[in-house]
Amino acid sequence: LCLCTLHANNANQAIDRILSFFPSERHSQVLMDLSLNLKAMIAQMLLPHVSGRGRVPVMEVLLSSPLIADHIRSGNLHLIKEVMTRSTERGMQTLDQSLLDKYRQGEISAEEAIRCADSANEVRLGIKMFDRGRRAFGDSVDLRIEG
């Protein structure tokens, strides 16, 4: 078990940060090592609660799988986010999915969710769809945005 902190907002940035600690000629070996040994990665932000009292954790969760390991090993880090978006049943979650969940639960503001998003346009669209559904069907609506 290895726990560490890095200044990164998501899993892709964390892997990029790890690579930056090594000279470029060692990157392929580092990616191989990560693909074989990384079991999970969690990126967390603490955002202000909509009430102004306290903080709300939003988290990106990357869990190892054969496909994730292949993407890491081959250096195709840009493909990881798509796999995470489609793997919520396995426990994975992107930062943007977490932001939308916290907005739906009334814990963070739309402005805060959009400000902290990896893809502000996707989060803005998710918020708009949720708000339209809530106006049309009442507060019991629960729209999920998945890839």
Model-based region annotation:
Residues 1-147:
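Short, flexible helix-loop junctions that flank or precede catalytic/ligand sites
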